[in-house]
Amino acid sequence: MILDGNRRWAKSNPTAHDPHGHKAGAGKIIEFLGWCEDAQVKVVTLWLLSTDNFKRSQEEIDALLKIIGETVDELAATGRWNIKAVGAMDLLPAWLQEKLNALKPIRKDGVEVNVAISYGGRREIVDAVKNYMSQEANAGRSLADAATNLTTEDISKFLYTAGQPDPELLIRTSGEQRLGGFLLWQSASSEYYFCEAYWPDFRRVDFLRALRSYSVRQRRFGS
C-alpha cells in the first residue's frame, strides 16, 4: 500500500491545521487495517517513509518521524497485529531505531503488518546482495565463487520481507500511476491498482473497488 497524497490533501484542506497532511494520513491507518481484517488479507505492507523523503526540509522530516513513532506505538498498543519494520534502519534517528527494534510478534494469527520506513526498493536489493556476500565471505568463499553461485532465491532470503509471500496486489492512492521503487523485487508478478483519492480521503468503498478489480483479473505469471 503506497499511502500517497498527504501533502496535496493538506493543500486542498487549508483549515485542517495539518500543514503536511501526515497526521491525517496516520489517522487513517488503523481504520484501513480493520478493512484488511474484514477482507481476510494476511499480509499488508504500508509505505510510510521512503529514502527519497529525506530530501525534504528537516522540519518536515522531524515532524514526520515523530508522527511515525506515535503511529507505531498506536498500532502495537492495539494488540491486533504483528508489526514489523522494514527499511534502511541505519538512516533513522536512534530513538526511532530503538522503538522499531523492540517490535515483537504478539499473535499467531491476524494480519501481518509491515511498516516500510526509510524504505527504497533499490536500497533493499543492494542491502540483500551485501548481506549475501558477507555470508559467503564468512563461510570462506571467494568473491568470484560467491558471484557465480548467486541466485534469485539467495537475494530473496536477504530482503527486508524475507519469509513472506510476494504481494498479490499493490495499491497507490492520489492518482499517481507509478510505483516509485516500492517492493521493487517482490512486485515482479503483482497486480497494480491506482486510486484517485488522496490517502487521508481513502474510503472503504475505494478499498473494496481495488479488491473487486483484482478479483476479476486473470493473473499471468512470467509475462
Residue ranges and their predicted role:
Residues M1-S223:
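Flexible, compositionally biased loop and terminal segments
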